[in-house]
Curated annotation (Swiss-Prot):
Gene3D superfamilies: Isopropylmalate Dehydrogenase
Gene Ontology MF annotations: isocitrate dehydrogenase (NADP+) activity; magnesium ion binding; NAD binding
Binding site for NADP(+): T98, I99, T100, R105, K281, G330, T331, V332, T333, R334, H335, N348
Gene name as annotated: idhM
Protein localization: Mitochondrion
BP GO terms, sorted: 2-oxoglutarate metabolic process; glyoxylate cycle; isocitrate metabolic process; NADP metabolic process; tricarboxylic acid cycle
NCBIfam families membership: nadp_idh_euk (TIGR00127), PRK08299.1 (NF006156)
Taxon lineage: Eukaryota, Amoebozoa, Evosea, Eumycetozoa, Dictyostelia
Cofactor-binding details, from the entry: Binds 1 Mg(2+) or Mn(2+) ion per subunit.
Family to which the UniProt record says this protein belongs: Belongs to the isocitrate and isopropylmalate dehydrogenases family.
Binding site for substrate: T100, S117, P118, N119, G120, T121, I122, R123, R132, R155
Protein name as annotated: Isocitrate dehydrogenase [NADP], mitochondrial
Keywords, comma-separated and alphabetical: Glyoxylate bypass, Magnesium, Manganese, Metal-binding, Mitochondrion, NADP, Oxidoreductase, Transit peptide, Tricarboxylic acid cycle
Residue interval of the organelle targeting sequence: 1-27
Length: 428
């Protein structure tokens, strides 16, 4: 059920779009797309992207949800739940970056409480996997020069250390783990006999979540036509990580090996240390399935290896074919403060543009709308070609010029979006 507040927001968004005067040659979108608005500088860019790069070319009325922090607070975060359920129904969503409040934000916005991460809420409701991959521009230097193709990290963002129970052991004693089944005898394991103080932790995962993760990874690899690697430390965690390894292998052999063979791609399990070394020596061009902690760490390492967090895509998918995209960076608070002062900003909008094109491209694939798929591809090409032609925001100019960057070397926020529109109109 959609809350009354969300219905009102959706209605207002539809009226706004319908009031605009656009070309009659726009590409018609018949399938639903859920749009989730966000916060601060990314919210400002979001409106500009829609008005200059999306709505002039695409005839679409998104199902709109305002996930800006003030509205999440006003709805007691119900709007986030409504948005997640809407994505589940529509299959396609596109999200602007949002604030996850800490104590300082609670005070700044006068919040009722410290609301949870909207990404986490959406991910849990959809039981999805987050895939992060780079947008590669030939003229931007790479920290890992050999990475010529994308490395896409698929993170199993469920359980493990992130749902663990940990505590400090203050003195000697026996640490035990007990599982009490609903039927049958309890299972008791002695973990350690402490002679003094220390620390302890217990964590878990579920077969259903690992299975859904495996399906998402295999399906995403097929969509990208890239080989898939799963990394674990099953030589040490023989039961825990062994479960990941066994589930992936069983599902691959039963459901995906034939399709992988037809595409000339493959699946392979590797130890995490071996996989890290392989990734650094490779040229890229694969999907890397990681457990929760590994994915958290490796996704940031990979992002920096390609040169810029501003050129990273983020897609949430699940085994049911749900697809929700967003930029992998935050709300760019520092730039927003400058914007509030009336100062010029040069904020990189590429990842936010790709959030829209990824969602619309996937909608086009589901609806067999070839014009929409081509629009998405051409708009992405316009983003890359503009950068490769020397038109970019300050963060990317610094990657090339370093401390020698001058104002003439980069465009401001709106100038870059305008330049992308200019390049798109040449390409289409």
């Amino acid at each position: 059920m959609i809350s009354n507040i969300s219905k009102k927001i959706l209605s207002n968004s539809s009226k706004f779009i319908q009031q605009q005067s656009y070309s009659t040659k726009r590409i018609k979108v018949t399938g639903p797309v859920v749009e989730m608005d966000g916060d601060e500088q990314t919210r400002i860019m979001w409106e500009s992207i829609k008005s200059k790069l999306i709505f002039p070319y695409v005839d679409i009325t998104p199902e709109y949800y305002d996930l800006g922090l003030p509205n999440r607070d006003a709805t007691n975060d119900q709007v986030t739940i409504d948005a997640a359920n809407a994505i589940k129904r529509a299959k396609i969503g596109v999200k602007c970056a949002t604030i996850t409040p800490d104590e300082a934000r609670v005070k700044e916005f006068g919040l009722k409480e410290m609301w949870k991460s909207p990404n986490g809420t959406i991910r849990n409701i959809l039981d999805g996997t987050v895939f992060r991959g780079p947008i590669i521009c030939k003229n931007l230097p790479l920290l890992v020069p050999g990475w010529k193709k994308p490395i896409i990290i698929g993170r199993h963002a469920h359980g493990d250390q992130y749902k663990a129970t940990d505590f400090v052991v203050n003195g000697p004693g026996k640490l035990e783990m007990i599982f009490t089944p609903s039927q049958g005898e309890p299972i008791k394991k002695v973990i350690y006999d402490f002679k003094g103080s220390g620390v302890a932790m217990g964590m878990y995962n579920t077969t259903s979540s690992i299975t859904a993760f495996a399906h998402s990874c295999f399906q995403y690899a097929i969509d990208k036509k890239y080989p898939l690697y799963l990394s674990t430390k099953n030589t040490i965690l023989k039961k825990y990580d062994g479960q990941f390894k066994d589930i992936f292998q069983e599902i691959y052999e039963r459901e995906y090996s034939t399709k992988f063979g037809e595409l000339g791609i493959w699946y392979e399990h590797r130890l995490i240390d071996d996989m890290v070394a392989f990734a650094l020596k490779s040229e890229g061009g694969f999907v890397w399935a990681c457990k929760n902690y590994d994915g958290d760490v490796q996704s940031d390492i990979v992002a920096q290896g390609y040169g810029s967090l501003g050129l990273m895509t983020s897609v949430l998918t699940n085994a049911d074919g749900v697809f929700a995209s967003e930029a992998s960076h935050g709300t760019v608070t520092r730039h927003f403060r400058e914007h509030q002062k009336g100062n010029e900003t040069s904020t990189n909008s590429v990842a936010s543009i790709f959030a829209w094109t990824s969602a619309l491209g996937q909608r086009g694939k589901l609806d067999n709308n070839k014009d929409l798929v081509k629009f998405a591809q051409d708009m992405e090409k316009a983003c890359v070609e503009s950068i490769e032609s020397g038109f970019m925001t300050k963060d990317l100019a610094i990657c090339i010029k370093g401390n020698q960057v001058k104002r003439s070397n980069y465009l401001n926020t709106e100038e870059y979006i305008n330049k992308v529109a200019e390049f798109y109109n040449k390409i289409k």
